[in-house]
């Protein structure tokens, strides 16, 4: 009808990480194609098991006058909503309704940051977390390799044998779930590591698969390969130091502390000192 604004066509894609689906809605077909390529392997096909996403975000693409990606991220909880901001994006998310919006330019980095933040907030309520850690599956078991930048996450990933499946070389996704006992007699509470599309120096997406976590290794470079046990208190402190955490929220700080305590009482933690040689993998497992 004359006088009515033309309806804008909308495009959607569901990106599922760690079994949590996020639907991204946009009016830009080119941006949609970029997301489908960027998150290949984590995009849920129509009718897939996670096609009914847990959360919806509408993306408003516009030149961002305040664009400065070097500005630190801010995540604040106010009136039931999470307000997220960095130099290159602004976003808002209401957990009660599962809906939110993102204002950014047409780039993959801003929405990648929002996804990381949202997943950390979701996992904090469930006893899980995202971790500065490489992770891989071997013989049906997942191993985490945590450390600060330069500790060797990418190196240990490059050295992985052919029978290992890389989940990530940068950000590990850990969920607290019921897992089947080894003897098949039932299930027990445990931790499962999932592949992520969050990449480090390898610039390679992890495999979209998962396995129970068998051990966490705290990385350190040295003159020889060695594995040393870590006390529960030290393990908890170092685990907390490597968790992704963005929010200025006391309740979530408590949740993260509890998640770290629960994890180190359930999963063995070791310090892995290594030289950049593939033989280090003979000591893992």
Regions found by a protein language model. Name each.
Residues 151-153:
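Conserved glycine(s) of the Walker
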């Amino acid at each position: 009808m004359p006088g009515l604004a033309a309806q804008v066509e909308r495009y959607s894609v569901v990106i599922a990480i760690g079994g949590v689906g996020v639907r991204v809605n946009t009016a830009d077909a080119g941006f949609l194609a970029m997301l489908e390529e960027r998150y290949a392997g984590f995009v849920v096909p129509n009718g897939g098991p996670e096609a009914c996403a847990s959360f919806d975000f509408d993306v408003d693409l516009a030149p961002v006058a305040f664009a400065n990606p070097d500005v630190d991220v801010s995540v604040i909880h106010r009136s039931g909503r999470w307000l997220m901001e960095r130099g290159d994006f602004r976003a808002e998310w209401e957990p009660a309704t599962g809906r939110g919006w993102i204002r950014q330019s047409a780039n993959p980095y801003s929405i990648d940051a929002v996804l990381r933040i949202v997943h950390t907030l979701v996992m904090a309520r469930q006893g899980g977390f995202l971790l500065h850690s490489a992770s891989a599956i071997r013989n049906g078991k997942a191993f985490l390799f945590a450390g600060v930048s330069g500790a060797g996450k990418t190196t240990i990933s490059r050295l992985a044998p052919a029978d290992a499946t890389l989940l990530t070389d940068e950000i590990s996704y850990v969920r607290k779930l019921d897992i089947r006992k080894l003897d098949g007699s039932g299930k027990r509470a445990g931790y499962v590591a999932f592949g992520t599309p969050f990449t480090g120096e390898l610039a390679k997406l992890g495999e979209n698969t998962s396995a129970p976590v068998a051990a966490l290794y705290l990385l350190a470079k040295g003159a020889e390969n060695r594995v040393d046990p870590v006390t529960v208190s030290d393990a908890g402190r170092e685990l907390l130091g490597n968790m992704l955490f963005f929010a200025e929220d006391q309740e979530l700080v408590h949740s993260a502390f509890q998640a770290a305590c629960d994890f180190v009482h359930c999963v063995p933690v070791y310090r892995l000192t290594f030289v950049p040689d593939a033989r280090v993998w003979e000591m893992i497992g």
